Design a protein with these regions (language model features):
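Ligand-binding face of N-terminal immunoglobulin V-set domains in extracellular IgSF glycoproteins
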Residues: 14, 55-100
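Short beta-strand segments of immunoglobulin-like
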Residues: 1-5, 18, 114-120, 132-133
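N-terminal V-set
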Residues: 20-53, 136-160
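Aromatic sugar-binding surface patches on proteins
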Residues: 51-66, 165-180
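Extracellular Ig-like/FN3 beta-sandwich strand-entry sites
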Residues: 10, 75-79, 125, 188-192
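Proline-enriched interdomain boundary motifs that mark the N-terminal boundary
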Residues: 1, 106-114, 226-229
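Extracellular/luminal immunoglobulin-like beta-sandwich modules
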Residues: 79-105, 191-228
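Cleavable C-terminal sorting propeptides in eukaryotic secreted/cell-surface proteins
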Residues: 236-255
């Protein structure tokens, strides 16, 4: 059973059991204490459906093995399970494990990365912010440095306090995460900075996510910052300039 489904979309919930059809008596689908769908072998028709909050049941795609829900809203989220009953040698009933379904309203744009400049010197502090598009639930943000996850100690999460939409079921929110770390030596002189915005949170780069958006920027890294004159050199230059000015004045006075 999928863990996530998209608002307005559809989902198939499967009841995996190994009972052969000739031994099967009944299969029920429930959400909490509420009945959703029931199959009883030998009845005509064999199916009976109840109203499902937040979804419509497609009976043509439902059977003793699965139910198919369409037109999903947030109210369809919750814990589902199936109950399988056998008729031989005597009626035996067993409940499946509860499986949670979360309805999401995904991001409609890539995250935005902002930073003060696109060139840094080794040893400087790099600070960047990543802001996601709104979604429900809010996306999780993961920073990647040259495709490697940045340690959480270098990041800090913020809330912009902006809620999009009205009512509990329609509100969406953005996520913000700051990166702050010292720039180190890089072989190619380039730093590839990626912001991943995902639902659910980060597992690895190749995982399947219910919702994923990426943004990548490249930052040039220079080995040395421009050399500044030492106090002694600065003082010597000032003294030399003063002497040159005095010589010019003396020359003009004599001639």
């Amino acid at each position: 059973m999928p863990r996530y489904a998209v608002k307005g979309g559809e989902v198939t919930l499967k009841c995996d059991h190994s009972v052969r059809l000739e031994h099967l008596h009944k299969v029920e689908w429930k959400k909490g204490d509420d009945k959703l769908f029931m199959y009883v072998k030998g009845r005509t028709p064999p199916f009976k459906a109840w109203e499902i909050p937040g979804a419509k049941l497609n009976t043509r795609k439902s059977s003793e093995k699965q139910i198919h829900l369409t037109n999903l809203t947030f109210a369809a989220g919750g814990s589902y399970y199936c109950v399988v009953s056998m008729e031989t040698p005597s009626i035996f009933t067993r409940d499946s494990d509860f499986k949670d379904l979360t309805i999401i309203d995904p991001q409609d744009d890539d995250p935005k990365i902002t930073f003060k400049k696109d060139t840094y010197y080794i040893g400087e502090m790099l600070e960047a912010n990543c802001t996601t598009a709104p979604s429900k639930p809010p996306p999780h943000i993961t920073w990647l440095l040259n495709d490697v996850k940045v340690r959480d100690s270098f990041t800090k999460s913020f809330s912009n306090g902006i809620v999009h939409g009205h009512g509990y079921f329609e509100t969406k929110a953005s996520s913000i995460k700051q990166l702050s770390m010292e720039v180190s030596q890089l072989e190619d002189g380039k730093l590839r900075l990626t912001c991943m915005a995902t639902i659910p949170g980060y597992v690895n780069n190749d995982s399947d996510y219910a919702d994923i958006r990426n943004s990548t920027v490249y930052i040039e890294i220079l080995e040395e910052s421009p050399a500044l004159p030492s106090p002694v050199e600065a003082a010597s230059s000032a003294t030399l300039l003063t002497l040159n000015c005095m010589l010019v004045v003396l020359f003009l006075w004599l001639f």
